[in-house]
Amino acid sequence: MLKPALLNVDALHFGYPDALLFGGLSFQIHPGVTLLRGGDGCGKSTLLRLLAGAIEPQSGTLCINNVSAHEQPGVYRAQVFWADPQSTAFEQTTVRDYFAVQSSQHAGFDQQMLASAIEGLGLEPHIHKALFMLSTGTKRKVWLAAAFACGAAITLLDEPFTALDGPSIAFVMQQLTNAARQTQRAYVLADYVAPAAIALASVIDVGEQAA
C-alpha cells in the first residue's frame, strides 16, 4: 500500500515557442524512490526544475505537503533539494561553505549523514576547494552529499550516476536502497533506466523525446 503522496502535480503545462514539453501532465510522488524515465530531449531536467520551483509552468499546480508552489513559493522551495547543474551560483564557494549554506537552508540537515557521504564519496581532499576547481564528477559528488544529508521532503536527482567512479556509485546505490524505505521523504531520480535492485515507489515515463 502506497503511503500518502508528498508532492501532487496536476494538469501541468510547459513548453517553448517551438516545442510543447508537457501538456496536462498529472502525477503524485510518494515517499521512497520514484524514477522519472525518459530519453534525450524529453524534458526530464526541465521537469525537475519545475518540481523544484526553479521555473514556473504556464498552467497547472504543484503542491508539496499541501503547500502550493504558486501561492507560497518560498515555503514550497524550502521543502525541496535541487542542485541545478547549469547554475554557476556557487562556483566561487568552497565545498565546506557550500555544505554550510545547504545546512542553513534545510532544517532537517543531517551532519552525521554528511560526514558519511564525504567519506563514502571520497570528498575529504576537496573540502577546502572552490567548486569551479572541481571536475564534473567531483562536483556531482558534492551535490549528492548535500542531497543525502539535506533532510528535505523532496530530493531531486538528475542522472546521479553520471561521471562517478565505482566506489561512489556503490555508495549512491546504498543510499538509494535506504531511501526506498523512507516513510517521510521522497527521492525523484531522473534517468534513462531504473537503477538495479532499487525498490521503486513508482515510475513516471516522460517519453523518448519532447512532444
Regions found by a protein language model. Give the residues of each.
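A short, flexible loop at the N-terminus of ABC-type nucleotide-binding domains that lies
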Residues: M1-P31
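Q-loop/switch helix immediately C-terminal to the Walker
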Residues: Q86, E91-A107, M113
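Helix-to-loop junction immediately C-terminal to a conserved catalytic motif
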Residues: A52
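Conserved ABC ATPase "signature" region
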Residues: Q111-H126
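ABC-family nucleotide-binding domains
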Residues: D158, D165, I169
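Conserved ABC transporter NBD signature motif
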Residues: P57-Y76
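Hydrophobic anchor residue at the start of the ABC signature
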Residues: L144, F148
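Conserved ABC ATPase signature
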Residues: A130-G137
